[in-house]
């Protein structure tokens, strides 16, 4: 790339910020006062010897369908940031985290991302559970060249057709879980399946992956029932299931919806008939539901009682930092956010700069040991799709708990090499480095 092209790329983010600032001010979105953006704030730092803080925007739900998971992933990111700040920050700069509620709504996610980048000058964005929200945030992030860590949303499209050079996906996706969970369930559950699907991008693409595994192994999907988000009364769907009498029900339902579904299935004693397979079960969605409601087989990426080095210390650190929490022990959502944030900050340190392209190149292809991540297999970031390939666990309710919170029984684990989403590799077309705006925070 020529010097002229480099200059153009490095200034493109500043130009976008300026244009965005003028547009927002003109529209009156921040009131009648002129919009000064981050420059007014940074002017004060320029007058002192102290380095300005490194701002990280936490784009996590505090309301809506995934509020509980949003709260847990926020704690995970905050813990990783605290550990770095306790050691002096990163590159001699204290890390400042700002949070805005993305409300489990794509439009809100987009507005939050725009505001954090253009007004708060966030160097990085972290967080998402709802895949539609993650996609919306990532489009804004790519426009500015801002690195965005999708910590917990798991539609296969996130590292597939909706991938971006600046986006890194840290959770297992629907295809990974389907390959690990459904294939095994086919051996004991029978041929006729019904799919119960949350009617949005994650649900659709997760059930698509589940259907592919079922049919590839000689099974048949006799019906797919689409469930609108924020459904609380599942009686019509459960009546339909009673009429169909499938061998197995595969659910791609999440957040508060899966809590309501589980409770109503138990009330009708329908968990005692067909086999229930939940593609992925996030810890905040079942914590505190009670023994009967945690039926079936499901996937996860981490559990607080894995017999691995570092796990007990990790749990103790959570309880010390966040005493009195309703969720007394960390789960997969917290673990994903912590690991993502920690690796990002490690990459900044290794790069010796916050320059986005340099940090992106440190993240791409990054390998992380099983010991370091407290899992059974090494993990890595696929340089083609930017998804973290990690251990996938199959679990069920633990009928012999060692303590009150010990509600999962880990049945098996899958090596990430065995459950990779091969379709994502073909669907993902990352933007070039040259087409990605360059900046140094």
Please report, for each region that a protein language model flagged, where it lies by residue.
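Sec-dependent signal peptide hydrophobic core
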Residues: 20-28
């Amino acid at each position: 790339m020529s010097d002229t092209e480099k200059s153009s790329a490095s200034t493109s983010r500043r130009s976008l910020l300026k244009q965005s600032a003028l547009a927002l001010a003109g529209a009156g979105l921040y009131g009648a006062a002129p919009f000064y953006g981050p420059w007014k704030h940074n002017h004060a730092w320029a007058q002192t010897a102290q380095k300005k803080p490194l701002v990280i925007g936490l784009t996590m739900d505090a309301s809506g369908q995934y509020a509980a998971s949003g709260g847990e992933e926020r704690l995970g990111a905050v813990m990783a940031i605290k550990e770095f700040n306790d050691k002096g920050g990163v590159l001699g700069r204290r890390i400042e985290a700002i949070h805005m509620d993305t409300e489990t709504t794509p439009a809100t996610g987009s507005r939050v991302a725009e505001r954090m980048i253009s007004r708060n000058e966030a160097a990085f964005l972290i967080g998402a559970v709802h895949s539609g929200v993650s996609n919306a945030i990532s489009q804004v992030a790519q426009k500015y060249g801002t690195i965005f860590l999708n910590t917990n949303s798991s539609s296969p499209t996130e590292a597939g057709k909706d991938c971006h050079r600046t986006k890194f996906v840290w959770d297992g996706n629907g295809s990974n879980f389907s390959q690990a969970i459904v294939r095994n369930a086919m051996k004991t559950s029978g041929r006729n399946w019904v799919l119960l699907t949350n009617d949005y991008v994650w649900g659709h693409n997760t059930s698509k992956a589940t259907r592919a595994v079922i049919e590839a192994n000689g099974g048949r999907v006799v019906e797919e029932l689409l469930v609108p988000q924020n459904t609380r009364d599942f009686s019509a769907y459960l009546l339909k299931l009673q009429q169909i009498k499938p061998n197995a029900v595969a659910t791609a339902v999440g957040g508060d919806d899966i809590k309501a579904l589980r409770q109503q299935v138990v009330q009708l004693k329908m968990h005692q008939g067909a086999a229930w397979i939940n593609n992925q079960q996030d810890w905040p969605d079942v914590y505190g539901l009670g023994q009967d409601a945690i039926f079936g087989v499901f996937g996860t990426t981490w559990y607080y009682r894995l017999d691995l080095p570092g796990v007990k210390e990790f749990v103790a650190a959570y309880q010390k930092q966040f005493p009195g929490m309703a969720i007394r022990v960390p789960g997969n959502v917290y673990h994903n956010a912590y690991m993502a944030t920690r690796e990002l900050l490690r990459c900044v340190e290794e790069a010796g700069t916050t320059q986005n392209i340099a940090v992106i190149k440190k993240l791409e292809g990054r390998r992380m040991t099983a010991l370091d991540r407290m899992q059974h297999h090494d993990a890595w970031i696929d340089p083609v799709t930017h998804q973290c390939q990690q251990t996938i666990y199959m679990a069920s309710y633990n009928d012999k708990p060692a303590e009150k919170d010990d509600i999962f029984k880990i049945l098996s684990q899958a090596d990430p090499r065995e459950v990779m989403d091969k379709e994502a590799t073909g669907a993902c077309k990352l933007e070039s480095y040259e087409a990605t705006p360059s900046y140094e925070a």
